[in-house]
Amino acid sequence: NLGSQLIVHESQEAIFCRDGQALDLFGPGRYTLETQQLPLLEKTYNLPTDTEGTFHSEVYFINKTEQMNIKWGTDSRVQYIEPTYGFPLSIGASGEMSLRAEDSRKLLLKLVGTESYLGQQQLTNYFRSFLMTRVKTYIAQVMKTNSINIFEIDENLTMFSNAIKNLLGGDFADYGVALEQFFVTTILKPDGDRQYEKFKELHFRQYADIAEAKLRQQTEIINAETEAQKTVIDSKAQATK
């Protein structure tokens, strides 16, 4: 009722709702609920001006802190054409992310609905199907667009993570949520697959051949320099006789 006290703690926002409408929004502080504090509610419902006036409504408190260490992982393998060698490949991925409520009103209307509580686990469950669909699409897209070699993916995880985060950011924003961090920590490769192992051997054999060629070249240079030094020494020895 009017005249009640509303306390909103730091890192919180409070939203007044009535009949399914998200109306007035309160930041951190202590409030006495009077008509001047509820402009949208008063405008919509023509509230009574006496402080004893009562009305039915709900207040939702939104935690604005960053929710960290939320684990994610693909529920099935992502199939795509490996960009370097052009063979079909299926991989999985997993990692962690952190989310933060950015637009409390949008979050409330799109996700909370009539629920009385929405914690980190519930939030993760809400986004599970949405996240799996987007992430699998973006994994294949980023691998192809950036021509990331599957055999060199581990050294490119930071770039890979940032690229997927940038693509996912707008999707989460549609729900009033900011994707603060997104990390790909593990890539599940098809180890043991005959075709994968064949190209893996080819890839690393190329590096081994290059390394051996460089080693032979360096050895030849050293041998040539050594022979040149021997020639100089022999010449000096002959000159002193």
Question: Where in the sequence are the language-model features?
Answer:
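Hydrophobic membrane-anchoring helix/hairpin
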Residues: N1-L107, S116
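Elongated, amphipathic alpha-helices that form coiled-coils and helical stalk/scaffold elements used
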Residues: Y60-K241
